A protein has these predicted regions:
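Periplasmic/cell-envelope proteins involved in peptidoglycan metabolism and beta-lactam response
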Residues: 1-160, 171, 180, 205, ...
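Beta-lactam-recognizing serine transpeptidase/beta-lactamase-like catalytic domain environment
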Residues: 138-185, 190-367
């Protein structure tokens, strides 16, 4: 009981399924959710009877980020439920309500997302299943995050059964944070970093690509079986040569690749406010060469989310330093005061700055 009262009480109070948060404050106008420039993404609108209806951006661009407040809660609406329902200067607000007819309003939540970038990301994704995540490398600030298929937060209650039964499209799934996929050739960033952390000699490691290579009892092919000829690390990275990076992984060994993947944050909790699944790296010290080769090129059992791979590339752009990703910039009181501004925090050092610079240069060769 002591533990419950002293240590766990805040968690229970803030829980999105706590009915007291909505039933106890029927006259409170729930705070708005805003983009970084102050555009309302979700806000309460007053009804004639004094109640409020939650209204959302109708594009669907923010559905997975903002979430909803019916059938339970999801997204920012869930994680920041307590903040949105909390009344700052409650006594003064209630006096203003009684004598001046002013609304009693909860705090606003201001996102790091820029609506202009969010629109660009949504247009680029179109109707392709997947997601786009944009991060500011030096801070970890999420500038855009979209997922498709999406849904309309305004009509979740009416469409609840359909949204939950659509297994083919899974519209409620935030693919940016909850979708786990093989990273494919983007994992070659990890393999390259792993080799360079061992020795700079791998920058000049040469390999003759014939379009396929044998690892154990498995034949590994380059895309379309194309032979790249003689390549070093830079040209192999630019051409995405599977044989090269599988061979390099065989040279450095399982334990080194495991170490680098761990250094980059695979299998690590992110402490991110939206529901997420952590990146999974399953290679073991005694895994055979076939599995090692597949892992080195982003296949095998490795699974990661778009958010996490955006963090990986951001670490390369930030001198090897991976920042804690965040999507809420600050809390804003009804009077406009800023509270609880999120400060950039370093999550981990993924690799040396010199290694990051070399990989960044190689990434430019891909474009």
């Amino acid at each position: 009981l002591v533990k419950l009262c002293l240590f766990d009480s805040n968690g229970f109070v803030a829980n999105s399924f706590n009915p007291r948060l909505t039933q106890g404050l029927p006259d409170v106008k729930r705070g708005a959710i805003l983009d970084i420039n102050g555009k309302a993404i979700a806000q309460d609108e007053a009804n004639s009877d004094g109640s409020y209806t939650r209204k959302y951006d109708e594009t669907g661009n923010y559905a997975h980020v903002v979430g909803y407040t019916v059938k339970g809660k999801a997204g920012i609406e869930s994680k920041y439920n307590f903040r949105l329902q909390t009344v700052s200067n409650e006594l003064l607000q209630r006096i203003g309500h009684v004598f001046l007819g002013k609304e009693i309003q909860g705090n606003n939540v201001v996102l790091t997302i820029d609506d202009r970038l969010q629109q660009v990301a949504a247009e680029a994704l179109g109707h392709e299943k997947g997601s786009i995540v944009a991060i500011e490398p030096s801070t970890g600030k999420i500038l855009a995050m979209v997922s498709y298929p999406t849904f309309d937060s305004n009509t979740v209650s009416e469409n609840w059964a359909e949204l939950n039964s659509d297994d083919e499209n899974s519209p409620l799934l935030n693919r940016a944070t909850q979708g786990l996929y093989p990273p494919g050739s983007t994992f070659k960033i990890i393999t390259a970093a792993s080799a360079l952390e061992v020795s700079q000699k791998y920058m000049d490691f040469n390999f003759k690509c014939t379009g396929d290579a044998k690892f154990g009892d498995s034949i590994l092919h380059c895309y379309d079986g194309k032979a790249h000829g003689k390549v070093n690390m830079t040209s192999a990275f630019a051409k995405s040569c599977n044989g090269y990076f599988a061979t390099v992984a065989e040279e450095i060994g399982n334990d080194q690749l495991i170490k680098t993947a761990t250094d980059f944050g695979f299998n690590t909790d992110l402490n991110f406010p939206l529901e997420y699944k952590k990146a999974s790296f399953a290679l073991k010290s005694d895994s055979d060469v076939k599995e090692l080769a597949a892992t080195a090129i982003g296949q095998g059992k490795t699974l990661t989310s778009p958010l996490f791979m955006a963090m990986v590339t951001s670490a390369i752009a930030n001198n090897g330093s991976m920042m804690q990703p965040y999507i809420v910039d600050h809390i804003e009181t009804p009077g406009g005061s800023v509270k609880n501004r999120t400060l950039p925090t370093k999550l981990l050092q993924a690799c040396d700055s010199s290694t990051a610079h070399q990989i960044a240069d190689m990434m430019c060769e891909v474009v």
